[in-house]
C-alpha cells in the first residue's frame, strides 16, 4: 500500500509543526518555501500554554525552555499607574505558564526536530507555488524555480504560506483585509527595570499602546537574554517612526509623561551605540474563512485565520492547527487510505469553534486598544478593572489568554493536547459550523 505523500506550502510555524507530526506518523512530506533559506524576521512572540502543549506533544518543549523566557502573566498599565489588565496563568491552572521566544529560536527548535525525520522530508527552497489542481486521486501543484516552471503530484496539499496567501481557495474566504493599525518593533537587551516574567503593556486611550515582552535568547547567543519592544501606530505612520533625532525626542517625551521609568530605560537603549535598536514594521491582516479544508486541500496557520495580535494567539493557533490535522488524519486513515470528508469533519470539530471564538474576540477588543474612536479607551478603562474584581471573570480571561478556549463556556485541558492518545474519540466532539457569533 502506498504511503501518503503531503505537500506543505510554507515553512512557518504551522507548516513546520505539521510536517513533524505527519512524518512522525510515517507519512512522506514535501515542503515548498519561496525563500532561499529560513531566516525568520519578526519580533519575539508569546507562546501561550496551548502552544506549549503542542510543543510537548511534538517533543520540543524542553529544548524551547532552555532558550525561551518563562512568562507568568500579562499586566497592562495606564498612565496613572493603575493596572487595566492583570491576568496571570495561575488563575486558569497552577501549572500553566507562557514562553516568550524569538522567531529565530522558534524556527530553530522546529527545524531541529524535523531533521530527525529527514528520510521522510523533502525540501524545495526558492520554489514558488502559483496554483494547484485537485483530481480524484491526487493534487497537482504548479510553480516556478529560477524562472523554470515545475509541477508535481501529491496525495494532499496544505496551504501554510501566511496571511497574504494567494493560494487559499477564494470561495472559502469570507474576509481578507489589512488592519489599519500595525506596530513598530525592535529586539533589545533584556529589560532590567520591569519584572522579567511578565508581558508588560502600556495604554493611553485607544491611540497609544506599547509592549515589552521577555524574549529569551537566540541559539547562537544563548547567554544574551532579550526583550521585544512594540509601539502601536496607524499603518501609514510606520515607515517614518523614529527616523530622526526630533522624532526620537518627541517619542521619549510621550512615554516619559506617562511611564517615566520605562522612558529612562528606552533612552538608555536608544542612545547606547552598542545596543542601538533597529526598528522594523509589522502589518496585520484579518482573514476569516467559511471552511479550512475540503477534499485533498487544507489551509492552516495565518493563511487560514490571520488576525490582530491583540490576543497574542497567532503562533498558538498555528500549532493547534498542526496538532488538530495530525489527530484528524489518524482518525480518518485506515490502511494508508484517507477518508477525506471524515478528516475535515473531525478537523473542523477540533478547530472551528475555537478559531471562531478568538477571531470574534479579536475583532471586538482590538478597537478598544488601536483605533481613532474617541469613546473606545474610556469604555475599556471603565469596564476592565471592574471585571478583574470578579473571580469568575479573572479565571475565564486567564483561560482565554492561555489559548485553550473552544467557545465562550468551553475549553480544552492542557493534557488533552500535550499527551493525546491516538484514539481521539475521548473528545465527545459535536459537529459545529463556522458561523459567526
Can you name each region flagged by the protein language model?
Residues 5, 28, 226:
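Residues at the starts of beta-strands that form the adenosine-phosphate
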Residues 23-43:
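Glycine-rich FAD pyrophosphate-binding loop
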Residues 14, 37, 164:
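Conserved Rossmann-like nucleotide-cofactor binding loop
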Residues 36-56:
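Conserved N-terminal glycine-rich FAD pyrophosphate-binding loop of Rossmann-like flavoproteins
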Residues 111-116, 122-280:
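Conserved FAD-binding catalytic core of PHBH/FMO-like flavoproteins
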Residues 2-6, 23, 50-171, 175-187, ...:
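Conserved N-terminal helical subregion
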Residues 11-24, 32, 158, 278-374, ...:
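Conserved mid-domain beta->alpha element of the FAD-binding
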Amino acid at each position: 500500500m502506498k504511503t501518503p505523500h503531503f505537500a506543505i506550502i510554507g515553512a512557518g510555524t504551522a507548516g513546520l509543526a505539521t510536517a513533524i507530526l505527519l512524518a512522525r506518523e510515517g507519512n512522506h512530506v514535501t515542503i515548498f518555501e519561496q525563500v532561499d533559506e529560513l531566516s525568520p524576521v519578526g519580533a519575539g512572540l508569546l507562546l501561550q500554554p496551548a502552544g506549549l502543549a503542542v510543543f510537548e506533544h511534538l517533543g520540543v518543549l524542553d529544548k524551547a525552555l532552555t532558550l525561551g523566557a518563562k512568562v507568568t502573566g500579562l499586566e497592562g498599565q495606564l498612565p496613572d499607574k493603575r493596572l487595566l489588565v492583570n491576568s496571570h496563568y495561575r488563575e486558569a491552572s497552577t501549572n500553566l505558564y507562557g514562553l516568550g521566544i524569538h522567531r529565530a529560536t522558534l524556527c530553530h527548535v522546529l527545524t531541529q526536530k524535523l531533521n530527525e525525520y529527514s528520510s521522510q522530508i523533502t525540501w524545495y527552497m526558492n520554489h514558488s507555488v502559483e496554483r494547484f489542481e485537485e483530481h480524484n486521486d491526487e493534487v497537482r501543484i504548479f510553480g516556478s524555480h529560477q524562472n523554470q516552471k515545475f509541477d508535481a503530484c501529491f496525495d494532499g496539499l496544505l496551504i501554510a504560506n501566511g496571511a497574504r496567501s494567494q493560494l487559499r481557495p477564494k470561495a472559502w474566504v469570507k474576509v481578507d483585509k489589512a488592519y489599519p493599525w500595525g506596530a513598530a518593533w525592535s529586539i533589545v537587551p533584556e529589560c532590567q527595570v520591569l519584572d522579567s516574567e511578565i508581558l508588560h503593556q502600556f495604554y493611553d486611550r485607544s491611540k497609544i499602546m506599547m509592549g515589552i515582552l521577555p524574549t529569551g535568547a537566540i541559539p547562537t547567543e544563548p547567554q544574551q537574554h532579550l526583550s521585544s519592544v512594540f509601539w502601536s501606530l496607524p499603518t501609514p505612520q510606520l515607515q517614518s517612526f523614529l527616523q530622526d533625532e526630533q522624532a526620537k525626542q518627541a517619542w521619549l517625551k510621550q512615554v516619559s509623561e506617562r511611564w517615566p521609568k520605562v522612558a529612562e530605560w528606552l533612552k538608555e537603549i536608544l542612545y547606547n551605540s552598542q545596543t542601538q535598536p533597529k526598528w522594523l514594521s509589522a502589518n496585520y491582516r484579518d482573514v476569516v474563512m467559511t471552511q479550512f479544508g475540503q477534499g485533498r486541500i487544507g489551509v492552516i496557520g495565518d493563511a487560514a485565520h490571520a488576525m490582530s495580535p491583540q490576543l497574542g494567539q497567532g503562533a498558538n493557533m498555528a500549532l493547534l492547527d498542526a496538532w488538530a490535522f495530525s489527530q484528524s488524519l489518524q482518525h480518518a486513515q485506515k490502511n494508508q487510505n484517507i477518508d477525506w470528508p471524515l478528516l475535515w469533519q473531525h478537523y473542523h470539530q477540533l478547530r472551528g469553534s475555537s478559531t471562531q471564538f478568538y477571531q470574534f474576540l479579536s475583532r471586538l477588543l482590538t478597537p478598544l486598544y488601536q483605533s481613532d474612536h474617541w469613546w473606545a479607551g474610556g469604555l475599556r478603562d471603565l469596564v476592565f478593572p471592574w471585571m478583574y474584581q470578579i473571580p469568575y471573570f479573572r479565571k475565564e480571561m486567564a483561560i482565554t489568554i492561555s489559548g485553550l478556549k473552544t467557545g465562550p463556556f468551553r475549553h480544552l485541558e492542557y493534557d488533552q493536547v500535550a499527551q493525546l492518545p491516538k484514539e481521539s474519540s475521548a473528545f465527545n466532539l459535536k459537529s459545529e459550523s463556522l458561523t459567526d457569533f
